[in-house]
């Protein structure tokens, strides 16, 4: 298979983890933000080390991008460039998630932040053969009184570039019990729901995310392995797993790439999708993810078609966009 030419779909990609290093350098100079001494050092600070010890070390790579992403221009540009980078490797549909609350440090309103991200995406959609949507994330450690503000701020953009609500950040057992009020609020406003769960060993969180938070999709979810309740509910309800194989190895969720359960899950009828998570932090692309999965697990063209269709069906896109995406199957 020509992996670059394959049509691809990425449903789990973080904006602040997918910024071009040269853009960081350019914006940091504009905003007088202190940088590491040279480009190599900047890249090093943005990219997870080979011997990354855990998710917390992985998350440290977001510090510099978040410093520069505090103006309308920076957010719009970075949004555009992410969609441009994806389009140039034949990603036909991309859902990007970010936490607007992390971009208020210089006084931007939540509305301005969301509008800037959507504007950058729309500019890329006009220029390239790519469709997209945004997912509003909150981090588990956020003050709870800010969560409804994010949901309210995104509501005017629903169906116009925003589609879903996500809970992210470091994972602790039992976190779902704190959030039903907020996912219910988001559902009432018209959001779809995806939740990061089962990334850091806690398979029970996946079961809770589906039963308590009404999650339609699960970010990562690899640790349904070993938790029968979680495994069964994901399989029975056809809850899509947004797997991010390279990232899962880097954060030590999975010991090595060949141990990733994606192929095993697929064989057993679980809905799996292939995603990047963070293009810059993980130093990856969709082409790389698809290639590694197919080559490591011996997946055929037919297997890839099935995963591509899973991604289309699981996307928080309109029926019209889904029909458009299904049209690319014959190119595989």
UniProtKB/Swiss-Prot annotation:
Enzyme class label: hydrolase
Co-factor requirement: Zn(2+)
Listed name of the protein: Adenosine deaminase
EC number: 3.5.4.4
Record Pfam families: A_deaminase
Listed NCBIfam families: aden_deam
Cofactor binding note: Binds 1 zinc ion per subunit.
Species assigned in the record: Vibrio atlanticus (strain LGP32) (Vibrio splendidus (strain Mel32))
GO terms under biological process: adenosine catabolic process; hypoxanthine salvage; inosine biosynthetic process; nucleotide metabolic process; purine ribonucleoside monophosphate biosynthetic process
Classification via Gene3D superfamilies: Metal-dependent hydrolases
Site positions for Important for catalytic activity: 220
Lineage top rank: taxon: Bacteria
Role this protein plays: Catalyzes the hydrolytic deamination of adenosine and 2-deoxyadenosine.
Residues reported to bind substrate: 14, 16, 169
Active site, renumbered: 199
GO cellular component: cytosol
One Gene Ontology molecular-function label: zinc ion binding
Reactions catalysed: adenosine + H2O + H(+) = inosine + NH4(+); 2'-deoxyadenosine + H2O + H(+) = 2'-deoxyinosine + NH4(+)
Residues bound to Zn(2+): 12, 14, 196, 277
Listed InterPro entries: A_deaminase, A_deaminase_dom, Ado/ade_deaminase, Metal_Hydrolase
């Amino acid at each position: 298979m020509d992996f670059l030419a394959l049509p691809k779909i990425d449903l789990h990609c973080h904006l602040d983890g997918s910024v071009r290093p040269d853009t960081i350098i350019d914006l940091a100079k504009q905003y007088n933000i202190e940088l590491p001494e040279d480009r190599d050092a900047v890249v090093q600070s943005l990219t997870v080390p080979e011997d990354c010890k855990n998710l917390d070390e992985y998350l440290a790579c977001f510090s510099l991008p978040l410093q520069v992403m505090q103006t309308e221009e920076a957010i719009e540009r970075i949004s555009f460039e992410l969609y441009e980078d994806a389009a140039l490797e034949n990603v036909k549909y991309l859902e990007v998630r970010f936490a607007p609350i992390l971009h208020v440090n210089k006084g931007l309103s939540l509305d301005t932040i969301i509008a800037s991200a959507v504007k950058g995406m729309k500019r890329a959609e006009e220029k390239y053969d790519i469709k997209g949507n945004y997912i509003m994330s909150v981090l588990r450690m956020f003050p709870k009184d800010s969560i409804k503000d994010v949901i309210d701020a995104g509501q005017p953009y629903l169906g116009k570039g925003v589609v879903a609500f996500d809970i992210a950040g470091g994972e602790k057992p039992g976190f779902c019990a704190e959030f039903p009020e907020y996912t219910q609020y988001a559902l009432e406003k018209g959001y779809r729901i995806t939740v990061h769960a089962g990334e850091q060993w806690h398979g029970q969180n996946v079961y809770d995310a589906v039963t308590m938070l009404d999650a339609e999709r699960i970010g990562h979810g690899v640790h349904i392995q070993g938790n029968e309740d979680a495994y069964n509910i994901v399989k029975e309800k056809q809850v899509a797993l947004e797997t991010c194989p390279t990232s899962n190895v880097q954060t030590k969720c999975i010991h090595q790439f060949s141990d990733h359960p994606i192929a095993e899950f697929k064989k057993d009828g679980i809905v799996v999708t292939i995603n990047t998570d963070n293009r810059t932090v993980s130093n990856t692309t969709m082409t790389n993810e698809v290639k590694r999965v197919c080559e490591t697990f011996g997946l055929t063209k037919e297997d890839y078609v099935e995963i591509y269709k899973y991604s289309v069906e699981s996307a928080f896109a309109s029926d019209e966009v889904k029909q458009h995406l299904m049209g690319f199957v014959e190119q595989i």
